[in-house]
Amino acid sequence: MRTYLRVERLVNRLSDLQAGTSEHDHHFALQTLFELMDMGSRADLRGDLLKDIDRQKGVLAGYANNPNIDESALNDLLRQLDDAHHSLNETTGKLGHSLSESEFLSAIRGRMGIPAGTCEFDLPAYHDWLKQPVGARQKAIAQWMRSINPIPSVLKLMLGLLRDSAAPHSVVAKDGMYQQNLPQSRNVSLIRIGVPDGAGWVPEVSANRLLISVRIMRIEDGHRTQSMKADVDFLISNCG
């Protein structure tokens, strides 16, 4: 799950940077693309997503013929899962593996691991590319981004279904501590906690199959954290 969330964060960042117009935007877009390739080389995202799609289809199939369920919406979700499964089966190799064959990108990737390693005298061809018109750079990055398809769209579908599987409910952390027992019959894959902007505190979460534990940490000067000794209301969703 943490791998899914990290990939989602990188994909969103890459999309934002690709749409940018400055040389710095597109430099960091490539850096983000290389981070995605690094993650893809260490994790079998395709295999994990295929397993999770099959599991999700099994869960949704259990709602068939339920009078309280919108059959049209259910069939639409099952169709989306079938399409996602098919698109993943049509792909081969690791995330972005085809980009490894580009000498241009491989040279940039190799130098990005070195502090200030992408100066003009290190990578003149790269800096020539950075001086191209904005539209040309955006088009090139969009083309390179296709190498990670269909992972972003499949991941968006799966995480969306997971997040929508539970409604948030209000709880109170007494003296900054909250614990909740989990039923053995339910598999919780993701815990979501609502933190208001500027709240001045962050949650420190630990969990296993049977118990969720949340400690509220106050943010002090210097961005240090300290256990809070006050009651705190917050929203929590146990998704799974």
Predicted regions and their residues:
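Generic structural signal for well-ordered, non-transmembrane alpha-helical segments
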Residues: L5-E8, N12, F34-D38, D54, ...
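Hydrophobic/aromatic-rich structural module bridging two neighboring secondary-structure elements via a short loop
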Residues: S41-F104
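Conserved phosphate/pyrophosphate-binding and hydrolysis machinery centered on Walker-type P-loop NTPases
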Residues: E23-H26, E71, I141
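Extended, charged low-complexity segments
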Residues: N187-G240
